[in-house]
A protein has these predicted regions:
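Post-J-domain flank of DnaJ/Hsp40 co-chaperones
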Residues: 1-33, 65, 176-187
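Intrinsically disordered, low-complexity linker/assembly segments
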Residues: 36-187
Length: 187
């Protein structure tokens, strides 16, 4: 009897792969070269990926058999740390060192963004270390909404202040009245 055995399509297996990106590649997005089963191909990593994220590349896993679909390739993302910048959601966070005078009086402070371009933060008068100032839309670029570039204020003083600076600091404390006592009560 001429019985035919029906051959069922089998989908290909999914594969896993790891990729390490620079911080800038993770923030800006990047086209990367990959290989799977000896085949090389390029794919685009979207802007704003974070460390530990998984990206699915449909059809880039093991080939299907008998007309089955190819499996998927799952890319596990590792992002190298940057010495200056960090990512919080779509916002790029950077330190913003300023002087005591700039913190007290407020100031326009120039810094360099992730691309090395000069940008200006407006630090309001009375800012303390840890305060955050933003430049809207200068974070991770996203089709829906861009993140912000955030400067985290760090008030810095000279490591070896001279006598004039030490005297000025004492005069500043006197001029602030009860502020030092208020701080002492917070500790």
């Amino acid at each position: 009897t001429g019985k035919e055995i029906a051959v069922r399509p089998e989908n290909g297996e999914d594969r896993n792969s790891k990729i390490r990106l620079t911080f800038r590649q993770a923030v800006k997005g990047a086209t990367v070269s990959l290989s799977a089963d000896g085949k090389k191909f390029k794919t685009h990593i979207p802007a704003g990926v974070h460390d530990g994220q998984k990206i699915r590349l449909t059809g880039k896993g093991k080939p299907g058999r008998n007309g089955g679909k190819n499996g998927d390739l799952y890319l596990h993302i590792t992002v190298a740390e940057d010495p200056k910048f960090t990512l919080r959601g779509r916002d790029i966070i950077m330190p913003l060192p300023i002087t005591v005078s700039q913190a007290v009086n407020g100031a326009k402070v120039t810094a360099k963004d992730i691309d090395g371009n000069e940008i200006t933060f407006k630090v309001p008068a009375g800012s303390s270390s840890g305060a955050e100032v933003r430049i809207s839309g200068k974070g991770v670029v996203n089709p829906h909404e861009n993140g912000d570039l955030v400067g985290r204020v760090e008030i810095r003083v000279p490591e070896h202040p001279n006598l004039v600076a030490k005297h000025a600091a004492k005069e500043f404390d006197k001029a602030c009245g009860d502020f030092a006592d208020e701080l002492a009560r917070e500790r």
